[in-house]
């Protein structure tokens, strides 16, 4: 919750949307950064359209307004600097005040490249959730560097969780990763820990099994994937 509260510093706006294109752009960013293969735009669009027929899907977007945020940050920074110059900060609060100044200066550095480019706001994180009549699942999420900096990822998960609670769903499944939650493989242990902090219970399901309908391709595909990943590196 500490990270969710951090997102309040950036006046994020959370809206539900039908914008698959922006979501796809964001998840491609994650795929390139974290070395996984995202599906095509057509796949996500088809998925969304089919689930939307039954009102079993929602997209939660986190939007930031760089111009407003820069102006707000400049004002807060100036006020703190003036208080220090005028000796208005008690000694016991001086360290925290200087840390706040560093944070504000960093925010200006991060957001300045986006100034005067997004008057209607910039979507920095997009989360797709699916639903049945009694349960909710988070499925796909994409974000850019601003989404990471502003804790928009945590905020989107939190807002989807609140939405599930407000709509009286019996449970909200954050999904997980394959295998041991303490694994050292890639960032899977960190992903488990990230989701655990939302207060849920870790449940190990039976697992997934392949239904093989093309045996030849089934044998060849792992080798092709290995070659693909080697070339990509």
Model-found features: residue ranges?
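Residue-level detector of alpha-helical recognition elements and their boundaries
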Residues: 38, 42, 59, 153, ...
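A conserved beta-strand-loop-helix scaffold within acyl/acetyltransferase catalytic domains
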Residues: 1-148, 163
């Amino acid at each position: 919750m500490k990270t969710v509260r951090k997102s309040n510093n950036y006046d994020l706006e959370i809206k539900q949307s039908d914008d698959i294109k922006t979501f796809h752009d964001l998840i491609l960013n994650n795929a390139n950064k974290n070395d996984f293969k995202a599906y095509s735009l057509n796949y996500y669009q088809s998925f969304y359209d089919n689930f939307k027929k039954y009102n079993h899907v929602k997209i939660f977007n986190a939007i930031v307004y760089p111009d407003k945020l820069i102006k707000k940050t400049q004002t807060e920074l100036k006020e703190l600097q003036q208080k220090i110059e005028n000796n208005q900060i008690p000694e016991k609060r001086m360290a925290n005040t200087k840390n706040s100044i560093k944070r504000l200066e960093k925010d200006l550095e991060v957001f300045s490249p986006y100034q005067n480019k997004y008057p209607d706001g910039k979507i920095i994180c997009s989360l797709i959730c699916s639903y049945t009549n009694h349960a909710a699942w988070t499925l796909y999420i994409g974000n850019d560097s601003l989404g990471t900096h502003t804790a928009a990822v945590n905020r989107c998960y939190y807002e989807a969780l609140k939405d599930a609670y407000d709509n009286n769903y019996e449970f909200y499944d954050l999904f997980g990763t394959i295998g041991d939650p303490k694994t050292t493989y890639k960032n899977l242990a960190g992903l488990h820990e990230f989701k655990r902090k939302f207060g849920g219970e870790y449940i190990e399901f039976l697992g997934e099994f392949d239904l093989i309908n093309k045996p030849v391709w089934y044998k060849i595909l792992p080798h092709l994937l290995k070659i693909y990943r080697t070339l990509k590196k």
